[in-house]
């Protein structure tokens, strides 16, 4: 497996285009889950005071957090970390962590965060949904006992993609940007339930928004 394949797409140039293409065009027209109507409210609903954002993109969501928030960023891509940090405002950023989510987190991060977000991370990770269980486990270790893991991911199974979505799914999976053709809501619920007592999912278009708390 190579986590790098999903991260390579994010160069300084593509990050500038990301908001327009992914958060604007694709979310609305390909995936049927408009950012400002669905994903941004989901992000803010579960945000805790001490927050870790994993797979940070351009930092779009972080521009909407309260000034008092303490934010840490985790990504495999330095360009993403720097872009998100600059955009969110360096004063809000507590840590920038360059880390592969398949690997256990440093002990110093265990039990630290009130909330952890994974927005559009899981569908970019290599392998099927069951192989991504360790990603959930590693994140759970970094939460406080009453912390919440939440996010959103694009599904490939159990949803009906429109022609635009089908085309993007085919291209992105062929290029290794996505690895989600067999990802389902049921499969996601299963890997979340392995590590959390309380799991909620909601499908909007071809995107599933999830939250999980009560870590086991």
Positions of predicted regions on the chain:
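Conserved class I S-adenosyl-L-methionine
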Residues: 1-47, 60
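Class I SAM-dependent methyltransferase SAM/SAH-binding core
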Residues: 50-105
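Short amphipathic alpha-helix with an adjacent loop that forms part of the alpha/beta core around
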Residues: 105-111
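A short, conserved alpha-helix within the catalytic core of class I
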Residues: 125-138
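Core SAM-dependent methyltransferase catalytic element
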Residues: 195-216
């Amino acid at each position: 497996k190579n986590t790098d394949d999903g991260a390579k797409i994010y160069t300084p140039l593509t990050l500038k285009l990301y908001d327009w293409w992914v958060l604007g065009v694709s979310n609305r027209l390909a995936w049927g889950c408009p950012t400002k109507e669905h994903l941004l409210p989901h992000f803010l609903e579960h945000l805790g005071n001490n927050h870790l954002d994993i797979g940070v993109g351009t930092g779009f969501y972080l521009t909407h957090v309260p000034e008092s928030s303490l934010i840490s960023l985790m990504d495999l891509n330095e360009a993403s970390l720097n872009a998100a940090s600059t955009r969110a405002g360096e004063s809000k950023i507590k840590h920038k962590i360059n880390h592969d989510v398949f690997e256990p987190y440093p002990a110093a991060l265990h039990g630290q965060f009130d909330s952890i977000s994974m927005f559009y991370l899981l569908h970019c990770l290599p392998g099927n949904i069951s192989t991504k269980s360790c990603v959930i486990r590693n994140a759970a270790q970094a939460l406080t006992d009453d912390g919440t893991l939440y996010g959103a991911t694009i599904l490939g199974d159990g949803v009906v993609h429109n022609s635009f979505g089908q085309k993007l799914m085919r291209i992105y999976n062929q290029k290794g940007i996505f690895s989600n053709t067999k990802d389902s809501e049921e499969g996601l619920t299963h890997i979340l339930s392995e590590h959390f007592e309380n799991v909620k999912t909601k499908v909007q278009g071809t995107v599933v928004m999830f939250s999980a708390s009560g870590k086991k």
